[in-house]
Swiss-Prot record:
It comes from Coregonus autumnalis. The lineage of its organism: Eukaryota, Metazoa, Chordata, Craniata, Vertebrata. PANTHER family: SOMATOTROPIN, SOMATOTROPIN,PROLACTIN. Keywords: Disulfide bond, Hormone, Metal-binding, Secreted, Signal, Zinc. It holds the Pfam family Hormone_1. Disulfide bonds join C71-C183, C200-C208. Zn(2+) binds at H38, E192. InterPro entries: 4_helix_cytokine-like_core, Somatotropin, Somatotropin/Prolactin, Somatotropin_CS. This is Somatotropin.
Length: 210
């Protein structure tokens, strides 16, 4: 009987610590989701502003090219649809989000297009990406259970970003800017989706459907 009473304070302390860790985890998830939502909105606005500088025919042509082309970050294996996203583990979604954010650390520093909004926001974007990367890394450490059940393909090397647009034609500068902004918007939407699903799972909500 005495042993039971001795164990009770230990169990209570353990319970409080677990509850505190869960609350801190949710706080970090809230911050991460808010930051990527802001990045996604910025990406959407910059893309729309850039499209507004193009002629209608030019915009349609670039859109057709982009649909047939691919983003540098497409080398990162990620869920292909909502169903696969929902089936993915929290840890896998966090790792993919980390890789996607990491893939934009260098390109975000080279977004020097004629659009004054882009120039003004380039440093701010780099800082926000860096902060988000640190936050996701903390979430990964807090979610690890000692076993990473990720495929080898999830860790494949990204191609050098500097060579990604080297084969563009004479209108390469406009096309490069269009693809950079379109890919950035696309990837921020992906990360927002993955972090939102992961946050929902960690909060034990009944419905985490997209």
């Amino acid at each position: 009987m005495g042993q039971v009473f001795l164990l009770m304070p230990v169990l209570l302390v353990s319970g409080f610590l677990s509850q505190g860790a869960a609350m801190e985890n949710q706080r970090l998830f809230n911050i991460a989701v808010n930051r990527v939502q802001h990045l996604h909105l910025m990406a959407q606005k910059m893309f729309n502003d850039f499209e507004g500088t193009l002629l209608p025919d030019e915009r349609r042509q670039l859109n057709k090219i982009f649909l047939l082309d691919f983003c540098n970050s497409d080398s990162i294996v990620s869920p292909i649809d909502k169903l696969e996203t929902q089936k993915s583990s929290v840890l896998k979604l966090l790792h993919i989000s980390f890789r996607l954010i990491e893939s934009w650390e260098y390109p975000s520093q080279t977004l020097t297009i004629s659009n004054s909004l882009m120039v003004r926001n380039s440093n701010q974007i780099s800082e926000k990406l860096s902060d988000l990367k640190v936050g996701i890394n903390l979430l990964i450490k807090g979610s690890q259970d000692g076993v990473l059940s990720l495929d080898d393909n999830d860790f494949q090397q990204l191609p050098p970003y500097g060579n990604y647009y080297q084969n563009l034609g004479g209108d390469g500068n406009v096309r490069r800017n269009y693809e950079l902004l379109a890919c950035f918007k696309k990837d921020m939407h992906k990360v927002e989706t993955y972090l939102t699903v992961a946050k929902c799972r960690k909060s034990l909500e009944a419905n985490c459907t997209l």
